[in-house]
Amino acid sequence: MRSRILAIVFAARHVAALPLAAEDAAATLSLTSSASSTTVLPSPTQYTLPNNDPNQGARNASIARKRELFLYGPSTLGQTTFYPTGELGNNISARDVLLWRQDAANQTATAYREANETFADITSRGGFKTLDDFALLYNGHWKESVPEGISKGMLSNYTSDLLFSMERLSSNPYVLKRLHPTKDKLPFSVESKVVKKLTATTLEALHKGGRLFLVDHSYQKKYTPQPGRYAAACQGLFYLDARSNQFLPLAIKTNVGADLTYTPLDDKNDWLLAKIMFNNNDLFYSQMYHVLFHTIPEIVHEAAFRTLSDRHPVMGVLNRLMYQAYAIRPVGGAVLFNPGGFWDQNFGLPASAAIDFPGSVYAQGGGGFQAGYLEKDLRSRGLVGEDSGPRLPHFPFYEDAHRLIGAIRRFMQAFVDSTYGADDGDDGALLRDYELQNWIAEANGPAQVRDFPAAPLRRRAQLVDVLTHVAWVTGGAHHVMNQGSPVKFSGVVPLHPAALYAPIPTTKGATGNGTRAGLLAWLPNERQAVEQVSLLARFNRAQVGDRKQTVRDAFAAPDLLAGNGPGYAAANARFVEDTGRISREMAGRGFDGKGLSQGMPFVWTALNPAVNPFFLSV
């Protein structure tokens, strides 16, 4: 497997791995040049608004040249947003692929070495005899590729219903919704006496009281698993318990075969298998839904690239945030989603299903830019605000995301004020910035950015919102579902297998001899489990701290600090301080006297800004 990824030959093999001053490259690039002969010039050393540029003519000509050479091409990896094409677009894609390969090389080699060591150790200990033996996968292993280790509690508490339910409010919060008391119907029924015993009330009362929540993966029923692998298409009902004030699971419906509905009152192995089947669906969702966290900022940046000078302060920040961004789709197509590639080797549903899914979400109206703003998204699903039910007592994702976005927003507000003048609060400065307005028009026009702020952009608060959201997606939202999260949280086995290896049961009580060992038939064997962890470990980026590429470093690029003046430098200093405070709190998390952290029996740190890259890493 190692040789397959390292031996891939990309067109970008000889492209210089330095930041591309695209405007200058466009001005000098020969129309007949290849991807290996891109002219690379230094980044701008002074950022300025177009009306303040003493050489507006040359500036406008350079933008026109970029528009000739950087074009919107067909979507790849599913039918979502445009992917760059044209001579300059192809060169930038090739450059980013090379940057990605350089960044990933050490992580890849380390994960492969540690995989071999882990497999040898598991084999020497006799392999997996019970579900508890999956701890052999992790104990003492992956210390270099995953230096933070997997989440505390994720193995010791993997049978906990509270752990299972609270994953919806942390590791994968993007699929959960509260069922509105009047606008939403009950998705399926649960036996009344079971509901009464679990909740001390009725399903209808939970619904009416705004205490019922749904995760719906029934759409996965349309996909056919690979030979020898199996998948349900689970729906899960969760409820906010009025007695304990905890968020708990109520029922899981498989939607395939006999279409069984499981509850916590079933045999403990049947119920644990139901949670495993659900998490298998959930892992597919998180890994492929997150593709939209690539394509949305990509198309926003593409529109900016064709309309803003590289000397524009906003372009400088966007270029920084979109470091190596255009590598992910070609790399994914070459080694992850290719037939027989890493996806097919590890997941139950085939790569063709994985590629189809984000396009299906997009075709059904997903992928809206403003709809993805944190507060707006969570309110639309009834998870914050009290319009449709009682407040969630613990919402770790929202708690951490709110703080990180607050730090990003403070930076962006200071950046926008220093760029356009803070003293008089003159939002007319935005209207006079014709490049900025061209970007907004381009995004709403040829780029077809869904749900982008309308042109013209009149208020600087709107610009702050846009820039904050791009930085949040590239350095926050993406990493909740990808990057290091799967190997540390959402992909930890035995609770989160990428594939199931036995048929979905048609009757209850089919899970063996009453011990957890009976569940091994559905789970990956020793080699398959090591391969899953190895793949997910390769998604992690353990070296970003040493390379000064963390979220804390997002705005500290030397050219940005040198070219934007003291206001920018002061904003960056505060951002570093704010994110340092957040990081220290996260790093110090542990369990309270009840064995809980943020109301969960596992420690969640997926948004740590001192650990995560500031960019779309994988």
Swiss-Prot record:
Q: Binding of Mn(2+): at which residues?
A: H290, H294, H478, N482, V618
Name of this chain's protein: Manganese lipoxygenase
Q: Where is the Lipoxygenase domain?
A: 47-617
Locate the compositionally biased regions of type Low complexity.
36-45
Tell me which EC number(s) this protein carries: 1.13.11.-, 1.13.11.45
Q: Which key words tag this protein in UniProt?
A: Dioxygenase, Glycoprotein, Manganese, Metal-binding, Oxidoreductase, Secreted, Signal
* Similarity field: Belongs to the lipoxygenase family.
Sequence segments annotated as region (Disordered): 36-58
Source superkingdom: Eukaryota
Origin species, per record, is: Gaeumannomyces tritici
Q: GO terms for molecular function, please?
A: linoleate 11-lipoxygenase activity; metal ion binding
- Enzyme class, top EC level, equals oxidoreductase
Describe the processing and modification events after translation.
N- and O-glycosylated.
What the record says about temperature is: Optimum temperature is 60 degrees Celsius. Enzyme activity decreases sharply above 63 degrees Celsius.
Q: Which reaction does it catalyse?
A: (9Z,12Z)-octadecadienoate + O2 = (11S)-hydroperoxy-(9Z,12Z)-octadecadienoate; (9Z,12Z)-octadecadienoate + O2 = (13R)-hydroperoxy-(9Z,11E)-octadecadienoate; (9Z,12Z,15Z)-octadecatrienoate + O2 = (11S)-hydroperoxy-(9Z,12Z,15Z)-octadecatrienoate; (9Z,12Z,15Z)-octadecatrienoate + O2 = (13R)-hydroperoxy-(9Z,11E,15Z)-octadecatrienoate
What job does the chain carry out? Lipoxygenase that metabolizes linoleic and alpha-linolenic acids to 11S- and 13R-hydroperoxy fatty acids. At the end of lipoxygenation, the intermediate product 11S-HPODE from linoleic acid is then transformed into 13R-HPODE as the final product. It also acts on alpha-linolenic acid producing 11S-HPOTrE and 13R-HPOTrE with subsequent transformation of 11S-HPOTrE to 13R-HPOTrE as the final product. Gamma-linolenic acid is a poor substrate. Oleate and arachidonate are not substrates.
Which BP terms in the Gene Ontology apply to this protein? linoleic acid metabolic process; lipid oxidation
By its UniProt entry, which InterPro entries does this protein fall under?
Answer: LipOase (IPR000907), LipOase_C (IPR013819), LipOase_C_sf (IPR036226)
